[in-house]
């Protein structure tokens, strides 16, 4: 054990400061402890691109503008359909739809700097207690805890303001010369984090519902056309009309409503996401080195149990936490011959998840060291591996605005259920005013998005192409490698490998 204190204080030109403190102490030959603490604060990178996500156009020239770092403009509709609905309700005279182009228009959004502050902070600490109860033995019992919280901006499928999040880990470990066992739990809390896209969408909707905004936009288009304006001028008048009285960033109305929206976890009216997920993990292993002379043998395994708890804001866990388990076992043997110049390694691992059949992943490596000074090494290896889908691959149920992400674990698509309103044009074709869609419909009863866009443009049903969506499954990999490493002189070393994955 070593004892001491380390203090570090760093700063940068972009209002950045980083402080690190470390402390360790050996109380006796049996007991020691260490503590680390870190604090970071600064100004985060400001994302301010207003270019459209798809065609990189610049607002306001694009009426259906979805800016990269503009939020709330994801809400869009075809204003010709709105005009038809208004005529049906008697809000526009018959024939007025002739003055309204069949174009998709998006609502006016807010910039990222309006939705979140760019300052970033990080506070973290860890501590450990280490105890060796038996004199002359390497048996050690230890406890390590980790804690972290902070604030930052995060880019995922949407842009998120991560605020006051909390993550903790607690680990208990017992080790000896030939074996070990460790168990730990990791838990997180999303704190006051929120989705900036839905924050902007729902601030807009609090000020003026989508139906009202698009109806006023259509009214502006009609008035502009009747006044002799060209279509570009009419669009400008329409947006000005629909945005009249809009809450501006910095106003008391905007700030008060934003504060309420980001504390509401219902994405139809708010933007907060909750996550109190955790997982428990156990590792264990035994080394038979001192038992057998003919080979080095190790065996072990692991168990991991998940508890996903986002209240339906991230996963499909509206009715309660989603729990599942993964297990794994491994064995490895190394046999040496020819004065330890030849080494043969054989390993086998078996992993199983509740949602997938068990997977074997064998590995074999043969290496030979040549040369009088053992300075030439040749190796050949055959390896297999796989990756089990992540918790999000399996259980996500996230509304991302213009897209919905639905994991494909057994039963997960059926748990994702949403009701959608149908446009007047759709209702004219006999479709009900609202339809209920599940994630299973997306997997089993859907068309490719590009073919739907082609159909919408041409009106030809033959352009529709049924989507064939595969359910997620473990990724598998096989690798073969031939390698050589040799020191050919005091100043020249060759390290080369040929492999195929």
Predicted regions mapped to residue ranges:
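Outer-membrane beta-barrel translocator/receptor signature
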Residues: 1-53, 121-123, 139
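Transmembrane beta-strands of outer-membrane beta-barrel pores
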Residues: 9-15, 39-43, 145-151, 176-178, ...
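Membrane-embedded beta-barrel scaffold of Gram-negative outer-membrane proteins
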Residues: 411-501
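Short sequence motifs at beta-strands and strand-loop junctions characteristic
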Residues: 12-15, 107-109, 113-122, 162-166, ...
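Surface-exposed extracellular loop regions of Gram-negative outer-membrane beta-barrel proteins
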Residues: 122-168, 297-306, 320-367
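Transmembrane beta-strands of outer-membrane beta-barrel proteins
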Residues: 3-7, 33-37, 139-143, 170-172, ...
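Residues on the lipid-exposed face of transmembrane beta-strands in outer-membrane beta-barrel proteins
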Residues: 21-25, 125-131, 170-176, 282-288, ...
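Face-selective signature of the C-terminal outer-membrane beta-barrel domain
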Residues: 171-356, 495
